[in-house]
C-alpha cells in the first residue's frame, strides 16, 4: 500500500474498467520519500489487448485521473518509456489495479 497518496480503490477500478485498462501502477517519486505536495503522480497503464487509444483520449484520461487523485497525473504506457529505463520502471512500479 502506498503511504504517499490515498487511492479510492473502487473509483480507480471503475476508471480502469471504463477505459479498458488491464493494469495500472504507480512509479517514480510517489513511491519515494522525496514525494512532495507539489509532486505529480507517475502512472503506468497497460490496455486490454487490441485496445488502442489516441493522444487526445489519453489526455482526457490523464485529466480524469488527476481529478480522482487530486494531483496532476503523468500517464504512460510501457511503450511510451525510453528503452534505457523501461525495464527499471516496470520492475519497480507499484500495482494499484489488475483486471480480473
Language model: regions and residue ranges:
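A short, structured beta-strand/loop element
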Residues: 37-43
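Catalytic core of pol beta-like nucleotidyltransferases
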Residues: 1-25, 31-37, 48-100
